[in-house]
Regions:
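PLP-dependent amino-acid enzyme catalytic core
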Residues: 1-309
């Protein structure tokens, strides 16, 4: 059943939130700094903002969606996420004005590992391929075999471990420690903040969408897994538009971790069956993302698997 929660912490955030005391856990909105690296090292074409014909059918003024399917030929809305982080590390090593050949081998010898429900792992695999690094992607047993094979086409190694995303992340973190690899998750937790920089890559998408949209949106709907993507876009929306648009976070009914956490006033783990919305089927939130969404989101809602098809 669909549920809707009004966020009582909107505009103020969780009271006495310890996450706000750590500067590394603050969600970034500095898209200008991100663009410098992306334009120099990745040079992606803009993705289109499309006006949907559904608006007339449902009786609203207009409905717009950002189509990321062809971004960097990846078919992923997180194409510029982990790839941005690796581009930044490459530019720090060889310089923003380095040749394409120098960039291609700039991270040679480095191994990055992560767990993913899909999109983030693909972005890391692509970034490693572009800059000469090695990527190892941990996937849970619920991720389709076809997607695992697709990630391998980017040169990454794939390890299937755990019954869900959280178990595969634990396995990836353990492997990173044992092998001295770099763990690059798009999530954040206590004493781990690298996901904040991954989230910064999503600012490119948000910036493009807001600049292209001819009207100020009244409502912005953002899908959530662990919360990194919507937290980044919502934070930038508040910088760009202020408090005018209503921001709604959308999750599967089987994994309403942002809704449940905001309802509880703190991060909680949720239980549920496996959702067919596999890339959103996450039961534990990113702490930095949740902290930010507590102040930037107005509502949380869920949709059922049946409604999503």
């Amino acid at each position: 059943m669909t549920t809707v929660l009004k966020n009582k912490y909107a505009e103020t955030g969780f009271p006495n939130d310890p996450i706000l005391l750590d500067p590394k856990m603050i969600v970034r909105t500095d898209v200008e700094a991100v663009k410098v690296v992306v334009d120099a090292c990745l040079k992606p074409e803009k993705s289109p903002l499309i006006k949907s014909n559904l608006a007339e059918n449902i009786g609203i003024h207009s409905l717009w969606f950002k189509d990321e399917r062809n971004r960097m030929n990846m078919g992923s809305f997180k194409a510029i996420g982990a790839t941005y982080v690796l581009a930044r590390e490459a530019s720090e090593k060889v310089g923003l004005n380095a040749s394409e050949d120098d960039l291609k081998k700039s991270l040679k010898g480095r191994t990055y590992v992560t767990a993913s429900a899909g999109n983030h792992g693909l972005s890391l695999a692509n970034g490693a391929r572009l800059f000469g690094a090695k990527a190892i992607i941990y996937l849970s047993k619920t991720v389709p075999t076809e997607f695992a094979e697709f990630i391998k086409t980017y040169g990454a190694d794939v390890v299937v471990a755990g019954e869900n995303y959280e178990a595969s992340m634990a396995a990836a973190a353990e492997a990173a420690t044992q092998n001295n690899w770099t763990l690059l998750s798009d999530s954040t937790w206590e004493n781990y903040s690298a996901g904040v920089d991954v989230m910064a890559g999503y600012l490119i998408m948000a910036s493009e969408a807001f600049e292209e949209c001819p009207v100020t949106p009244t409502h912005i709907f953002l899908q959530a897994g662990i919360g990194g993507f919507p937290a980044s876009v919502a934070a930038f929306a508040r910088r760009y538009y202020g408090n005018e648009p209503k921001i709604i976070i959308v999750e599967p009914t089987e994994a309403p971790v942002i809704q449940a956490s905001i309802s509880a006033g703190k991060a909680v783990e949720v239980k549920g069956e496996v959702s067919i919305m596999g890339r959103l089927d996450c039961k534990v939130p990113s702490l930095a993302a949740l902290s930010s969404l507590a102040s930037t989101a107005n509502y949380c809602m869920t949709i059922t698997d049946q409604e999503s098809t």
